[in-house]
Amino acid sequence: CVLPAPVTANAYEYAKRLTIREICPKLSGFRADTHEKMGHLDHFKNGWIGENAGDSITFELEGNCIGIQYRKTISRPAVRAQAVLDGDVEHPVLLDGNFDEDWGDCLYIEPVLHHDEKKKHTLEITVLDDECVGTTPFYLMSIIVA
């Protein structure tokens, strides 16, 4: 059986999911979550936590597709953050940790780069200056790069 040639390239063929095990970003207020995962349904482990306004985390990445996997929680209010790719502060991406459903927390993926030129990128995520006291912290699960 011979398959026909692909119509389009598979942009995610070599995707990597980066957690505290695979990458060491620059932490400025964010902290690594080193709690041991207790099974495949124990999702919110091995990521990074931001709690206070101005906390930031910076990644040096290479790829043409980048996604941010974070927790949207039903434990509202939750901290919000913003992502800035390659210093483009005119076009930040909002990462809202508040989940509008009531069935449980959500592993949400926010694409920040899709089918662009493959090159080195800087991704900075910063906790916004919202009222953070008494809120659920921002939980960054992973960065997905292809």
Language-model segments: which ranges?
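Conserved catalytic region of serine esterases and O-acyltransferases that act on ester linkages
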Residues: 1-146
